[in-house]
Amino acid sequence: MNAALKSEVESRHAELAAICARLGVRRLELFGSGTRSAAPRDLDFLVDLGERPPAEYAAAYFALREELESLFARPVDLVTPPGLQNPYFRQRVEQEKTLLYAA
């Protein structure tokens, strides 16, 4: 993670943890341009929301995306572990990911 984004994430860690706890997030990890680029235009997160009824899962997913976009003032993409079907994509995510929150 570049220094500017690291500072931004660290300064908002308490807010980030509160959002994750409130929405029942198990793990939240940053990957993609946010871990490589000096000034990423968007942020990519790998999120584990655990097992839930479909409506509750969808509500948590979209609420998390909205709150992260508001917190970091830029577009956010969320990927869940089942979305890592492509082995090349999965490998890239595994290499780049940085843990931000774990319940």
Where are these regions (language model features)?
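Catalytic core of pol beta-like nucleotidyltransferases
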Residues: 1-29, 35-40, 50-103
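Short, aliphatic-rich beta-strand segments
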Residues: 44-47
